């Protein structure tokens, strides 16, 4: 969680969607604005008035107030509000993507770090095994082939160790980039990976599907875009009906003070806004198809993630059982070695078998965590239901008081 908060603050990708959301909020304010009144006025001159008797000048002032009809303003506000909500959900979607990047890069760093620990342990075991076999070869107890095989395994382990160290360095760079920092910003910082070593949570399939459909930002954003297109269609239909123009006027004609009140509007004779309505209907159909597509892809992604997670957790359970069995064998072999029943070479071979099982368990754990990340990405929610932080609070039922 701490790394995620750092990424939310420093990652530049979020600044882009935040700016887009701010622009959408500005559009919402603009949509709610009322039209300003118009004003005209000026002097006039009556050429038939005798100048000696009375002034021939006429002063007039006319106002023009627009009264919107047929709910145009409310539909315009509704469309802008749905577009603003879609932009807000885009921020949530981008934030989730950043969170997943941080999690994936943290998992890669954990995998490389743990692999280094296991490979260094195996390296010590391989070196001991090569040393013991060299002594037995010198004593004529084994053939050179056995020592050559041990040295090949030792060399392969060294190569794997060097590769793991390279992966660790690359993972630190990738993690720093996901956080929006330089790699040197992570120098001297101890990162905890306890979350990756916890038992995999059991996630009911029905709850996962429900959470995905109710919580995924892309699904909700597609729904908001459809609602916005619906409001735009209503707005275009309402524009068939003209607005009313109310025009009070005042005129000072010599000694006569006159006022007037005009009513005006556009006659919808030649243009009934059919073209704009047809375009809005097509865009609404497009938004509906887009929502259906996004929802179908979400369901497909959830089903695939559930299957992958189920298989990965089963493999991890088998790896745990295998490591437990190898640990029992190692303890038994250590007791036999202490009693002088087996040689140090035989004990080293069993220890290498245990190290290999631990490596397989690490790989299984990484695959399980990757599958869990894929499942979380399908839901766009953390796997622990109690820790869902992207859920809309308004959708959460209130707690009943007793």
Identify the function of each model-found stretch.
Residues 183, 360-402:
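Acidic, low-complexity, intrinsically disordered peripheral segments
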Residues 164, 217, 364:
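Metallo-beta-lactamase
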Residues 5-16, 22-37, 48-53, 61-79, ...:
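A glycine-/polar-enriched beta->alpha junction
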Residues 1-32, 36, 141, 190-227, ...:
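Bacterial Sec-pathway N-terminal export signals of envelope proteins
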